[in-house]
């Protein structure tokens, strides 16, 4: 258990679950922005990535604990493999947890707020979950493209 030395209040623990497959220079920035003693980071790197091509300092953090999953899946857009990789991250984190919050990110997401702001927000709203949605015209077109059209054989797409 981690304790805040200033007021003996238990610090909230956050698990950041990251699916990465490309743009590793952005992943490096993401990891540095999440490098906080209150965070543990779980990283799934797509099986198609040659690990030897990644710089080893990508995996060095000063404060957060980083767990790079040994089991790597070949993840394809729109395929069940995305869900399997997400579940693998969640199962791995829950075995090392518990955590107050689990955050699922891609390796190209970046937070727009500081870790102090994020942690304060979740402390203030402990016990609440936030599920965003939007119903604008542009979002409706994107929804129609993803939901109402068939995407057969996603496993064989070359991106």
Question: Could you tell me what each predicted segment is?
Answer:
Residues 1-159:
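ER/Golgi luminal nucleotide-sugar-dependent glycosyltransferases, focusing on the catalytic module
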């Amino acid at each position: 258990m981690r304790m805040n030395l200033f007021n003996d209040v238990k610090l909230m623990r956050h698990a950041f679950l990251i699916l990465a497959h490309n743009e590793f220079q952005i992943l490096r920035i993401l990891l540095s922005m999440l490098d906080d003693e209150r965070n543990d980071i779980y990283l799934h790197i797509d099986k198609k990535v040659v690990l030897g091509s990644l710089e080893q300092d990508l995996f060095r953090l000063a404060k957060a604990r980083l767990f790079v999953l040994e089991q790597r899946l070949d993840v394809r857009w729109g395929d069940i493999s995305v869900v399997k990789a997400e579940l693998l991250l969640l199962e791995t984190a829950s075995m090392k947890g518990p955590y107050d919050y689990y955050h699922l990110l891609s390796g190209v997401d970046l937070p727009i707020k500081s870790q102090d702001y994020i942690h304060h927000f979740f402390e203030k709203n402990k016990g609440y979950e936030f599920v965003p949605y939007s119903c604008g015209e542009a979002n409706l077109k994107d929804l129609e493209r993803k939901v109402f059209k068939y995407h057969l054989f996603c496993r064989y797409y070359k991106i």
